[in-house]
Amino acid sequence: TDPVKMPDFDILAEGKTLSGVAERLMSLSLTDNRGFEADQLTITLDDADGQLQLPPRGARLTVLIGWKGEPLTEKGTYIVDEIAHEGPPDRLTVSARSADFRDEFNVKREVSWHDVTVERVVSAIAHRYGLKPQISEMLMDIEIDHADQTEESDMSFLTRMAEMLGAITTVKSGNLLFIMPGGGVNAQGQPLPSFAITRSSGDRHQFRIADREAYTGVRAYWLDLNYGKKKKVSVKRRKPPKPKKEKSSSREGDYMEGAEGNVFVLRKTYQNEQAARRAAAAKWQQLQRGAASFSITLARGRAELYPEMHGTVTGFKSEIDNQDWIIAKAEHTIDNSGFTTQLELEAKIPEWIAETD
């Protein structure tokens, strides 16, 4: 049998370990989000003796979590934004959000963007906040003819632009990311570390697949002014080459694909083929992300897991085990029942091709 592992953590304020926290800790919860949803930290401490000092709002806390006897994993720096004290028995709850998210992100602006690339827009906004832009190569040179940012914050505008292109945008560790989601790669196209989860005792899971969302492709129409007629472009899954020998699991890999010919048609007619192709690709990726979801609570927490990592799970139904998964959200909790990690996973987006009809 495995030796009993003890959770461990360290909380630093302005670079120094906070003393006396370990004995008072009732719970520590850390949520890693994707997109413009700030990562959250919640710490509840026992104050039955009334000796705890209330930390100042705005204090910066750096958190490391893991297991005793193993190197701890740093999970970022957070700014205290809410403090609650309740009882009896008296306890103090400190809430903090990722230091990467600042109030000035919410300032509404008036900007008109004309004939610019995605790279120009993202870089200009990153520069305004002293952030480093990290943009997926395939998105950099996409041209934006015209876009109005009217009474809209930079982050809201970036999110809207990302949705239009099938991308996601967020701030992590001083970088403004504008990347393709669900591919398991960073902005430079390099693979993120992958994970492997083997089902073990105490783990809980939930798997969901919606057939109505399992489309095989997306079709968009555009107006060819040279010929004065509508043309269509289709985006669909790139079929892997057929294996020479039929394997028993080969059909199971298609379980999440959707019925043949189940094509989503975009109502809008686009002004050119490139715009139609881009809209179809963005919609296809959005549909793929929503088709299947899998959540799992690991009885033995894994601090090294974070959103956009991709990997595999084993010990579940073959349809689940045969799928490549991407972490959409990770929540780490240390309390009196130990250290657990709750993951929300999405199916990794398969490769696709665009065809002009």
Where do the protein language model's features map onto the residues?
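Interface-prone segments of viral and bacterial extracellular assemblies
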Residues: T1-P7, I11-A13, L72, A96, ...
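N-terminal export/assembly leaders
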Residues: F101-R109, V121-D148
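Short, compositionally biased
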Residues: T77-E86, V111, G183-V185, D324-S337
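An acidic/polar, Gly/Ser/Thr-rich interaction patch typically located in mid-to-C-terminal regions
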Residues: L28-Q53, G202-D357
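Polar, S/T/G-rich
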Residues: V116-S123, H127, E151-E163, Y215, ...
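Short beta-strand-centered interaction patches in the first periplasmic/extracellular domains
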Residues: R91, R97-D100, E137-Q206, R212
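Assembly/oligomerization scaffold segments
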Residues: T1-D103
